[in-house]
Design a protein with these regions (language model features):
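C-terminal catalytic-base region of ester-bond hydrolases, centering on the histidine
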Residues: 214-270
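Gly/Ala-rich beta-loop-alpha elbow adjacent to hydrolase catalytic centers
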Residues: 157-166
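Short beta-strand element of the alpha/beta-hydrolase
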Residues: 92-102
Length: 270
């Protein structure tokens, strides 16, 4: 008998390691996929912000807007950046750059601010914030003051989030004072040599009187606080009901009269 010869197993072939060019190509593909994914997320986020900022913008009520547009004592000029309110006669050489609240149309403030235009000869430039949100609008103050070259004394002001942005302008040397309507500062102006007027509403549930007083330490020493009994957040403009706000018991025309009287007194006492 012949003895069986031991079977010899043939080892399986081991794949050759990837060459450096192959590994480099794979890394590039992975990096490209990651970059495309990241860019897509940025584009989607930008689209989302654009849609959100332009949906639900609170428009000016037609009645008050018609009143100011048909008032022969007030001149209205619109530019891509702003609305300019000026007295038909007797401009004082003093101006106010006013910044709207978040997602509120700029022309919703024309009627409320037109009273002081007539009473004191004030020129008012109501800005059109980028994306309807003041914190996105980082344009210099001269973007708006240049719209009224005959004005030589400037105040800044705003409503709600617009007031927060106005506070940032208030520290500039060419600004004579700050006017806040239902608003407060986020930056510290306590050591800035300027003046401020803060009007609030007792029925304001957004910029509540408590929130305004909690931030009062950020305002200049020379600040006048004037609470308007019965006014809510939306009463500082004319754009209807605002979600989350309180119910106003004071008529809109009376709020306009108070704004006119207090702003006129403030700018005259400087």
């Amino acid at each position: 008998m012949h003895s069986a010869e031991p079977s010899s197993s043939i080892p399986s072939a081991t794949p050759a390691p990837a060459s450096p060019p192959q590994r480099s190509s794979r890394r590039r593909r992975v990096l490209l996929v990651l970059l495309i994914s990241f860019a897509s997320l940025i584009v989607l986020a930008a689209i989302g912000i654009l849609v959100w900022a332009n949906v639900g913008v609170m428009q000016a009520e037609s009645g008050p807007l018609a009143k100011v547009r048909t008032n022969p004592a007030v001149s209205i000029h619109e530019t891509p950046d702003s609305f300019i309110l000026s007295p038909a006669d007797g401009a004082s050489g003093t101006g106010l750059v006013f910044i709207p609240g978040a997602k509120v149309s700029a022309d919703a403030y024309l009627y409320k601010l037109s009273g002081v235009v007539v009473k004191s000869g004030l020129t008012v430039v109501v800005t059109k914030p980028i994306l309807n949100l003041a914190f996105f609008d980082q344009r210099p103050l001269t973007t708006f003051t240049n719209a009224a070259p005959d004005v030589d004394t400037w105040f800044v002001g705003g409503h709600s989030l617009g007031g927060v942005r106005a506070c940032q302008y208030a520290a500039e040397p060419d600004v004579s004072g700050l006017i806040l309507l239902g608003s407060y500062c986020a930056n510290d102006l306590a050591e800035v040599d300027t003046r401020a007027l803060s009007l609030s509403g007792s029925a304001d549930l957004l910029s509540t009187p408590d929130k305004i007083m909690d931030a009062a330490h950020l305002l200049p020493t020379a600040t006048t606080f004037f609470p308007i009994e019965g006014a809510n957040h939306a009463r500082f403009g004319d754009y209807g009901v605002q979600a989350g706000d309180g119910v106003a018991s004071l008529d809109s025309s009376i709020v306009r009269d108070v704004i006119t009287a207090e702003v006129d007194s403030f700018i005259r006492t400087g």
